[in-house]
Amino acid sequence: MSSYLRSFIFGLLTISLAQCSPILKDTKDTKFSTGSNISLKKRDTNVFDSVVDTINPASYFGTVSHPVTPAGVSTDSLSSPIETNKFFDNNLLGSRTNFMYADPFRYWWQSSDTMGGICIAHTDDNQRVMDTDDTIPSYYYEPIGICSLGFGASGITSNTDPIVDEIDQMSARFTFSWDSSSMQLTLTEGMAVTTAVYTNAIPQIFSSTLYINDFVEVPGTSAVQKYRVTMSDNHVWLIYIYGDSLTLTESTSQMLVGSNTFNGYIQIAKIPLGDGTAEALYDTYAGVYITGISISGYVEDAVGYYSFDFTTAGDTSVEPLFFLLPHQVDTAVSGTKVTSIVLASLVSGDMNAAAGNSITFAEAIPQDIGFLPWSPTGGQIGYSEEALEIIAEVAGTELGEDFSANSNLNSMYYSGKVLAKYAMLCVTINDILGDETSSEQCIQKLEAAFARFVDNQQIYPLTYDNTWKGVVSVAGLSGDSLADFGNSYYNDHHFHYGYFVFTAAVIGHIDPDWINTGNNKEWVNFLVRDVANPSSNDPYFPKHRMIDIYHGHGWASGLFESNDGKDEESTSEDYNFFFGMKLWGQVIGDSDMEDRANIILGIERNALNKYMLYADGNVQPTSMQPNYVAGITFMNKITHTTYFGTNIEYIQGIHMLPITPISAFIRGPSFVLAEWNALLASVIDYVDSGWRSLLYANLAIAEPEESYEYFSSSDFNTDYLDDGASRAWYLAYAAGLWANDAVYYPVSSSSTTTTSTSTGSVTTTSTTATASCTLPISYTSTPTTTSISGTCNGATFDASLYVCDGTVLCPIVNGVSYQNCNGACYNPSQYGCDNGALGPVQSSSTTSSITPTPTTTSSITPTPTTTSTTTTAQSTGMQLCGSNYYDASSYYCDNDQLCPIIDGVDYLSCNGACYNPSQYVCSDGSLSPNTVTTTKATTTFTPTPTTTTTPTPTTTSATSTNVIAQCGSAWYDSQSYICYGNILCPIINGSPLLACGNACYDSSIYGCSNGALVAA
């Protein structure tokens, strides 16, 4: 280990100790049972109705009209934002007759002269179509086109198109009007009874695919009239009539017709097959119907609460029935009575009907997960000497890449991935390596690359679509609707924009001044608003375009019709957006945005692990469990594949990328390991693309040692690294989770939250703090477990190892209690503290101690810093060289230059280069061999910087001893590299590569013309 890195690590340890943060430990579990009557104290602020911004995006992006216009939308509604990824969108596109999937029912407009209106369909699990070609089924779907019952009326024909209005994130209203008559239905997700409101109309109830086996009038309810109808598939439906007097009669085996013109409403509900109690429950809750659903929410401690608040009509003295999905049944805590009525959902397991005007749910949230790796086991993130060295080396290589050129692509998706790669690199350098100089260089390069997009100068700029109201790429507006994965048609916006929001959060984290510079904040907020605007008070975007709070995850597809409804191909890019949004809210100080994202992430962990990731407690068919992930989840179908191929690494991997600190919150270690052992371990050696490294990075969640060994291998093949992935970050992620032989523990935000179980309750955790970092002396491998005997600024500590000075924990080292000086801990026998600044104690008996973190260079390897004065009296202990303190046992200060002491020899300075005076002499700023010394001569090159583009270096005789030289701001070994201006090029087999522009090249293969490489 180099003396540079040793000093660097000790400096980091000093800073880490001074900034110890609490590691959260479980002390007590608070269980909220389903249907309990606990009192919830809500905050004044509803984070689901907090405006992000109201700036008109057209003023930044300009505006266009979209080539696809909403079909059937009322004139008044056209002026408002229109949802583009919701269950009812098929009715706004194309022929408008495709299916609308409002779990647990399917609806569609049946355009007909004889049976026109809205069809209702529901199928049970035994009607599901399963893949029978494979031993492990790769797909299933629910049969479509079965019109169990439908609402119609005399006078509705194929020319009577429904008008859509009252469009919201969970509902829309459909109105058929003819002459002076109308039929109106509000369709919502989860509604247990379907209601049609009639005005001056003769109702018709029909089925275009089934026949009526039995139809009877049933007395004894609050309804004007009630009927029970049994269809030819043996399913039983109930019909309730409210309003004017009306009698239904069976006109044909497929049609019930009203006796007269009617003003009122009719409700239809399905009795689960064989359920003898459901009818009485429906009778209790009939008469009321839902016309709208609003969402509210807040965060309290480490729990996120969200509520569905229903707007109702009809008999509002009655609470409405509403179907809950499995992840909601597990977490409902207030406002509802869960009934025994159970219907199968489309692809999300069994649903329970619950009664209530407002239903509140509680989810454990990732409140303390930030930019550093997070351990799902509650372990401490730590790094060994070896890991830090390898991470630094790899990060230095990646830092040399051209951020701007690599991210200047013709796709928002791919550009975003590259930017996020470099964001993770900057996090690695800044938060883990603690290299301020390289961090500054990294973030400046990242800001420059990001600026192209803020300035809207990318290959395909963004524009504001004034038709549907959103920010889209221009790539597909004039021809290919699938350009950039359909971004122009609102497909995958959460996948695309999540990378940009995450990158912006990293920049704001490292350089807070950037946030309010120019249009940076507004531009990022435009993306947040496009994907997840929470409020109707923002007139420029629909609410929650890409997230379905009811289902607990996002939907894609946008403005494309689909028989099976919207779909989700990548769970991980879904939650990546909300992780980026959480961090962005944090760095800009928008606590409502941060809380909202935390709640959504808590919901997604629960929902995704029940429906799309086949973890313990998931609801998918047992026969499909060996697939481990759904693949593509449609509203009506699951198929174990991708849109771009059927390789197993594609199907599993698209649910992994990108690997960030939130990954382990969603993807538990047991799930990751089971998936690896069953599907991936046997094929990993045959994966010859960037997917291989992604699979290994994901493995770090369960087996960090194996992941680390892969990424730290000396023969690591960069061909197996995706363009959107940073090897330095993958190393930092795996090494931090492994924490083997750790000597350094970065300030961490680790927390332990208990996932909700499948037994109908949610477990949340209250926490207490213990010290999360310790000072390893002589590089002890792991923190020592000790007894707790003190409290310092909320952190408990062992008073035999630490002292509390003010609010800072400082160590006791060799019996000496270190003291606090403005956040830094110091040995009082070696330092003094004057006005918050450390200074050395001038004493001939001082000994070497921990040094402050040295300023490091752009190559990431920590190095000495040049100074402005000369210190002549050298001795061991801490000395002052200009404004920098250094360990005089390891460095020598000579003429504004810190040079190392190697093998007892004080190296001297010569025009920026450090040299061994027994081997070299310095004359007029140039080094030449010391001819007095007898050495074995070799050929090397002068380290003096040159200024030409492709210079021929001057060779000199030299010894085999290294010369430590400086090139620009980087230090290098002159036997391995040569400096051209500020460009370092390697020496390979004794021959130096030449420089051309910023590239190094072999002159036997290439030439250089005007700063560009050409064939030799």
Swiss-Prot record:
GO cellular component: cell surface; division septum; extracellular region; mating projection actin fusion focus; primary cell septum
Enzyme class, broadest EC rank: hydrolase
Signal sequence, start to end: 1-20
Keywords, in A-Z order: Carbohydrate metabolism, Cell cycle, Cell division, Cell wall biogenesis/degradation, Glycoprotein, Glycosidase, Hydrolase, Polysaccharide degradation, Signal
Recorded catalytic activity of this chain's protein: Hydrolysis of (1->3)-beta-D-glucosidic linkages in (1->3)-beta-D-glucans
Region (beta-sandwich subdomain): 45-272
Superkingdom: Eukaryota
Phenotype upon gene inactivation: Decreases basal endo-1,3-beta-glucanase activity. Cells do not separate normally after cytokinesis resulting in chained cells.
Compartments where found: Cell septum
Entry keyword Manganese: no
Binding positions for (1,3-beta-D-glucosyl)n per the UniProt entry: 496, 567, 569, 573, 650
Active site: 492, 569, 573
Sequence ranges assigned to domain GH81 in this UniProt record: 45-741
Main location as per UniProt: other
Annotated segments matching region Disordered: 844-872
Residues listed as glycosylation sites in the UniProt record: 37
Disulfide bonds: none
Region annotation (Required for catalytic activity against insoluble beta-glucan and to restrict localization of the enzyme to the cell septum) ranges: 748-1016
GO terms of molecular function: endo-1,3(4)-beta-glucanase activity; glucan endo-1,3-beta-D-glucosidase activity; polysaccharide binding
Gene3D superfamilies registered for this protein in UniProt: glycoside hydrolase family 81 endo-[beta] glucanase (1.10.287.1170), Golgi alpha-mannosidase II, domain 4 (2.70.98.30), Immunoglobulin FC, subunit C (1.20.5.420)
GO biological process terms held by the UniProt record: cell wall polysaccharide catabolic process; fungal-type cell wall disassembly involved in conjugation with cellular fusion; primary cell septum disassembly
Residue ranges of the region described as alpha/beta subdomain: 273-364
Coiled-coil regions, chain positions: none
Function: Cleaves internal linkages in 1,3-beta-glucan. Has a role in cell separation where it is required for the degradation of the primary septum after completion of cytokinesis.
Family: Belongs to the glycosyl hydrolase 81 family.
Protein known as: Primary septum glucan endo-1,3-beta-D-glucosidase
Organism the protein comes from: Schizosaccharomyces pombe (strain 972 / ATCC 24843) (Fission yeast)
